[in-house]
Amino acid sequence: MNKTPVDIDQEAILLFHDLAEQRDNYARTDEKAGFTVSSEFRHRFFSLLDALNLRLIDDRDNFFGYFLFQADRDLRFQLDSPTGTTFKNGRYTLYFNPYLFLQLTAEQMESAVKHEVLHIL
């Protein structure tokens, strides 16, 4: 089965609108627990990261793509920047604030990932 390549910029716009809608719906509830996104959103977000990772692996600086491939990834809404990194239990975890990350272009997303990896090195 042949999959159509993901247009990262377009998918980021769609995901950002979905995120805003989920946040608006949450704000209209009396829910006391913290805001979380749907499992579908998480799946789509990490699929976008997979597409971005393929771009990094195909790049001449493919080290960054292979690093992202090996690292754990998660969402963290309270980050003050689009990305962040921690090292725990022998593994690196790259965190993404989708509010900030999804507003970047694909090239800026690549730069943000490279920037985080360079912090580690």
Language model regions located:
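Basic/hydrophobic alpha-helical interface regions
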Residues: 1-113, 117-121
